[in-house]
């Protein structure tokens, strides 16, 4: 691609008397007797990702250290689609006025540099809010924004050398897409928001400031996308999307408009900040969320949040997700990947006044929904919480924690009916191969029927066993090789106070579909315990529920009462 051919070379910066700023030139070019400045003459922006990322991070850390000598706004703009005028007459302010290409709703500008220091501003004035201005940096100079970038229309900013939105910066547009993946000349001229690796490795995309897309989506595209704790990214009438990948095609609005290819674990998305929108999506090879996500509107995707990784997808620390719909019902949250989980004090909440929403961690019910990829490992920490309650009048929602391999559930799930009416919800915590259950599920309903908890492992033993629970420490997940799932009698007794329980084993994976009751279970809540085994049920201890229902259904091996086993 001719416009990016120069990116295969090294550049240094020299002072340009005509422009009154530092510009990037080929490394063997003469400085022309320009102004001496030790702070800038020796600066080189190689296209190696590590060096470029270090320089970009340094620029962010120093708060744009070149402000004393560089023009305080983007430079060297040339319109390649439509028309653009560049007004530098106001101090520390650039006004760009665009006209769309004939018969289109977009314009495109190639820039030598696109950075805004603190105290400076750039305004891109477009024909209307539905217009789009594509801005590509065609040198090796990274973009660092510490001032204000605003537009009445949608902005696309592309810089393969890296993009940083520093702390204190404000990006205020109708919609905003930033990418460190390349956009080809052909795509720019056609107005296609399609991005891909083009030769050398792209830089990182880092946000520490505020980004708002008032009438559209905010989409951040790079192999590495990082949102700092100080960052706030908002799309009150659209979606906020972090897409860490090698090829990303933005074909339309919302989460359904994103198509990407990722490489795990190299393509990483990290969110420590606050993401707010109709919908929120994080797509990566590896993703970590420990900030705040709020999807509380309903114009595009209706309170929907998707965290999807080809590798690990974890909500950590005090990370939280809240999803509700404008119609008073709970939203929908999916956390999907090869290994998924909530650690520390992480939480997901789809509770709402008219009924709880849906939470899927690692898969959908029974792991059989082809549209929802299944995890191999799911882990819910002891202080982690998932809630899909009806807070006033309505039914509790649906919560699933699933893994084709191992699930360890130590946390808390609530899917309660409303205080003014409604029934409890439906919860499943299952590991197709192995399940460790040591948490608590609440599906009670103050003025309705208690809901249900489904446990769906290959085999399960109820008893005081030395079988160790799975652990997650330092990113290392450890679990025993034994295929049996486990629950203690006290866990079942406690759980039956707040849910009906169904234990349904299968002969999948390494298990044979058996249920072993090795130590007695008693309860007095009146809730139902149902044991359903593909193979056999082995009663080695009594089961007793005062005023309750015990139902058992065995497969080919039948029900075996080994002496002390009774049901009452």
Where are these regions (language model features)?
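An N-terminal, helix-rich hydrophobic module
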Residues: 2, 6-8, 12-19
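Extracellular and secretory-pathway beta-repeat/beta-biased strand scaffolds
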Residues: 8, 19-21, 26, 30-568
